[in-house]
């Protein structure tokens, strides 16, 4: 039985843990509160208290138990803005250093397509990164640091906008006026992210960088009003910006071509969302 440690048993990490456990993996994980630890344990996931303040705070015995694994999956989201970005960078680096000290051979890090910034047109993994937010810049720096680590295999998944239970896109712009209505959406369902991580854990070696994004990209001025109506909310209004370019379309096909991955939910218009 393979062992996997998941740091960040949140919206993505907890369903991932449950899915891997059901597949026969031995899963450990971390939460930032004692109540969260107990809730995870009640769900059958061996969990430990781990905080970033900004330094990594975890009981040494708990850290040893958490890091007794064949792979580490880091699903901690970077903050969108505000102070703490440098804390996130420091804490993740400390976490990875601890994993290396415990000789974990495989690391998977969930990054974001925000590292591409305002890129235009089709965006592939080889597209130059040009983040425009603090969190995007921190993720870019972390990606570079992880990619150059000696003695371990790191996979980086650049996730598009996440949707699924509790994250219905009909709420994103309901009742608002927003720009760039003609631009396509870049979204991915929770289950497809879980599927991609599971596939990578089963792959013989790492070192991959993949965009994870649904293949279909309906226009914002079609998609978001339809999603809002499904919830009985006021549809958003979109204005077409003459100077905003054609927008970016995240190409998530490389993982399909290289590893045979198949998106369960390729079209955001028909994804199960609640």
From Swiss-Prot:
- For this UniProt record, give its keywords in alphabetical order, as a comma-separated list: ATP-binding, Nucleotide-binding, Signal
Q: Which CDD domains match?
A: SDR_a4
GO CC entries: cytoplasm; cytosol
Q: Which domain of life is it from?
A: Bacteria
Q: Where is the signal peptide?
A: 1-24
Instruction: Tell whether Heme is among the UniProt keywords.
Output: no
Q: Where does ATP bind?
A: 170-177
Instruction: Give this protein's Gene Ontology molecular function annotations.
Output: aldehyde dehydrogenase (NAD+) activity; ATP binding
- Protein name, entry field: Protein YeeZ
Q: In which organism is this protein found?
A: Escherichia coli (strain K12)
Q: Which gene encodes it?
A: yeeZ
């Amino acid at each position: 039985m393979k062992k996997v440690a998941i740091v960040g048993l949140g919206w993505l990490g907890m369903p991932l843990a449950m899915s891997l456990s059901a597949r026969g993996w031995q899963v450990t994980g971390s939460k930032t509160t004692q109540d969260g630890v107990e809730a995870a344990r009640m769900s059958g996931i061996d969990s430990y208290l781990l905080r970033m303040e900004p330094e990594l705070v975890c009981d040494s015995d708990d850290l040893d138990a958490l890091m007794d694994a064949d792979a580490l999956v880091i699903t901690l989201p970077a903050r969108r803005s505000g102070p703490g970005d440098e804390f996130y960078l420091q804490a993740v680096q400390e976490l990875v250093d601890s994993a290396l000290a415990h000789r974990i051979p495989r690391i998977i890090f969930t990054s974001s397509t925000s590292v591409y910034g305002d890129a235009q047109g089709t965006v592939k993994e080889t597209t130059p990164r040009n983040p425009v937010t603090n969190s995007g810049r921190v993720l870019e720096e972390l990606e570079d640091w992880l990619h150059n680590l000696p003695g371990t295999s790191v996979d980086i998944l650049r996730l598009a906008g996440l949707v699924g239970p509790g994250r219905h896109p009909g709420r994103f712009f309901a009742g608002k006026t927003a720009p760039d209505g003609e631009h396509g959406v870049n979204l991915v369902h929770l289950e497809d992210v879980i599927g991609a991580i599971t596939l990578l854990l089963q792959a013989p070696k790492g070192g991959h960088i993949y965009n994870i994004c649904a293949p279909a990209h309906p226009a914002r001025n079609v998609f978001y009003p339809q999603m809002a109506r499904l919830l009985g909310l006021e549809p958003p209004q979109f204005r077409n910006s003459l100077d905003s370019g054609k927008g970016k379309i995240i190409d998530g096909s490389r993982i399909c071509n290289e590893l045979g991955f198949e998106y369960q939910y390729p079209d955001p218009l028909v994804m199960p969302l609640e």
